[in-house]
A protein has these predicted regions:
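Conserved active-site and cofactor/substrate-binding residues in soluble primary-metabolism enzymes
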Residues: 60, 76, 80, 84, ...
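Glycine-rich phosphate/diphosphate-binding loop of Rossmann-like nucleotide-binding domains
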Residues: 106-140, 144
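Short glycine-rich or small-residue beta-strand-to-loop segments that form or flank ligand, phosphate
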Residues: 66-68, 98-109, 144-148
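A structural-propensity feature for long, helix-poor, extended segments
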Residues: 137-165, 169
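Gly/Ser/Thr-rich loops at beta-strand to alpha-helix junctions
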Residues: 104-112, 151, 178-182
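A structural signal for small-residue-enriched, beta-sheet-centric alpha/beta enzyme cores
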Residues: 145-146, 175-298
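An N-terminal, well-structured beta->alpha segment
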Residues: 50-94
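N-terminal amphipathic/basic leader segments beginning at the initiator methionine
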Residues: 1-59
Length: 298
């Protein structure tokens, strides 16, 4: 059976409701909405195995931050987006202890570069706390890793991260990666936060070993940005919205040309979102204002 592809829990919840015109509450799943810094946040909590089976995702908390208004460049748009991202990170990570930030993805493949770009904006402090305690003793120890991809390194991201976790003993791993969305309107306009971990490369259809509590032994906060839409899923949705009969989607899915759709200005969008996510993580982990973060990174 053809399944519409999405990495977003909010869209998996939508698909369940659409599957048979369901309007009743889904057992094992709780969904709530709120606004932070003017940006909408939808939280989907998968509570048990029934919820896991319905949405096809592991139990945990999934929060989707809608940054559509970010691209309108309104008053204080960047600072508000940074604080909105940072607030989610604060609520889903421990208050103290070392942190390892992992920028997953292939920097040479633009839709997959959001992880490495976010890591570029992380304030690295682990080595400075011991070297210059008079200046950095009040900072939280933070290290960053850009593990690259298996095809260019010969090493699975999970293997590289596991080695560092064994060495650094972080209180949490924050993994940033690209995702796939069902809808074009959510591409580069949403950020998903999940305390269940992540499978590197899932956004561009290149699934690798998972990064989660079971594989690493420490909590993993996944921060994902949808940068692509699966072409078969997009086709099915457009035909459905137009009231036209669907083609043979199994045949379409089985074609060797596994196409992904991405915006034409994806270069600028992933750069902007990488910076917002990196700054948001800094804001959550360090007792600094955004202007101070900017000064330390410049």
């Amino acid at each position: 059976m053809f399944t519409k592809r999405t990495d977003l829990a909010i869209e998996a919840h939508e698909l369940w409701r659409e599957s048979a015109g369901k309007t009743t509450r889904l057992a094992g799943v709780k969904a709530t909405e709120k606004k932070i810094q003017g940006y909408p946040v939808t939280q989907v909590d998968i509570l048990d195995r029934e919820g896991e089976a319905a949405l096809g995702k592991p139990a945990g908390s999934y929060r989707t931050l809608d940054l559509t208004a970010f691209w309108q460049r309104g008053d204080g748009f960047f600072d508000r987006a940074v604080r909105a991202v940072g607030q989610q990170v604060k609520e889903l990570t421990p208050d103290s202890g070392p942190v390892l930030v992992v920028g997953l993805g292939n920097r040479a493949m633009t839709p997959d570069a959001v992880g490495p770009l976010a890591a570029d904006s992380i304030l690295i402090t682990r080595h400075l706390i011991d070297a210059m305690p008079q200046h950095f003793s009040g900072f939280r120890p933070v290290a960053a890793l850009r593990p690259g991809v298996l095809g260019t390194t010969g090493v699975e991201s999970a293997e590289a991260v596991r080695g560092l976790v064994d060495r650094l003993h972080p209180s949490v791993v924050i993994a940033v990666d690209a995702l796939a969305s069902r809808r074009v309107g959510r591409v580069c306009c949403t950020v998903q936060f999940s305390d269940t971990g992540i499978i590197p490369g899932s956004g561009v259809g290149n699934h690798r070993s998972a990064l989660n509590l079971e594989t690493l032994g420490v909590p993993v906060l996944a921060v994902g940005v949808p940068t692509v839409v699966d072409a078969a899923t997009l086709t099915a949705d457009l035909l459905e919205e137009s009231g036209l009969p669907e083609p043979d989607m199994e045949t379409l899915r089985s074609r060797p040309e596994n196409l992904m759709v991405t915006p034409r200005d994806i270069d600028q969008q992933v750069r902007d979102l990488g910076k917002v996510i990196g700054y948001g993580i800094n804001w959550a982990l360090q007792d600094l204002e955004i202007e101070e973060i900017n000064a330390l990174l410049s």
